Curated annotation (Swiss-Prot):
Catalytic site: 97 (nucleophile), 122
GO biological process: protein quality control for misfolded or incompletely synthesized proteins
SUPFAM superfamilies tied to this protein: ClpP/crotonase (SSF52096)
Protein name per UniProt: ATP-dependent Clp protease proteolytic subunit 1
Family, similarity comment: Belongs to the peptidase S14 family.
Gene: clpP1
Domain of life: Bacteria
InterPro entries: ClpP, ClpP/crotonase-like_dom_sf, ClpP/TepA, ClpP_His_AS
GO molecular function, one term: ATP-dependent peptidase activity
Length: 204
């Protein structure tokens, strides 16, 4: 995939940025593919950089992802909780599996979705092969991640853990309005003024 280049004019001449570097200057991070260790390292590095640059300003994490590695995603999640700025999450297109989990992990009141996105939660996927002992070890690990993710989803959404466990047994797709009612996000957004950031409406 060719990454677009942005040319900026200044008194010192022209400067060229790839589009993601230019967005990073505006404190925007784009998670736009399957979550793996390489992507997680990039997202974590950007979060830490923006935290060091200004701990008071919000970070905007746009998510369009089918999910991916649980351990890689948890690295992003832990960093979101570790840094000082609020992390506003915005779903554009699809937030499924770990993508939906990270969407729900944004700062309460600042978790959003564009109106035609889809959001899906389910239990962790995994496969094991080899000797019976190896399969048993992998099964225990999957059950561990399942419990942890369900606990956090219950915390993020306010839903009873029993409902989370039931709903994640199979792929559970939601519209943005349904995800808002479920507690995964706080607001469905359409457009915002030029030069501004999307801001969730928080009930007082």
């Amino acid at each position: 995939m060719t990454i677009p280049i942005v040319i900026e004019q200044s008194g010192r001449g022209e400067r060229a940025f790839d589009i993601y570097s230019r967005l990073l200057r505006e404190r925007i991070i784009f998670l736009g593919q399957q979550v793996d260790s390489n992507l997680a390292n990039l997202i974590v590095a950007q979060l830490l950089f923006l935290d060091a640059e200004d701990p008071e300003k919000d970070i905007y994490l746009y998510i369009n992802s089918p999910g991916g590695s649980v351990t890689a995603g948890m690295g992003i999640f832990d960093t979101m909780k570790h840094i000082r700025p609020d992390v506003c999450t915005i779903c554009t297109g699809l937030a499924a599996s770990m993508g939906a989990f990270l969407l729900s992990a944004g700062t309460k009141g600042k978790r959003m979705s564009l109106p035609h996105s889809r959001i899906m939660i389910h239990q962790p996927l995994g496969g094991a092969q080899g000797q019976a002992t190896d399969i048993e070890i992998q099964a225990r690990e999957i059950l561990y991640h399942k419990r942890r993710l369900n606990d956090y989803l219950a915390e993020h959404t306010g839903q009873p853990i029993e409902r989370i466990a039931e709903d994640t047994e199979r792929d559970f797709f939601m519209s943005p309005d349904e995800a808002r009612d479920y507690g995964l996000i706080d607001q469905v957004i359409d457009r915002h003024a030029a030069g501004s950031r999307p801001v969730a409406m928080v009930n007082q």
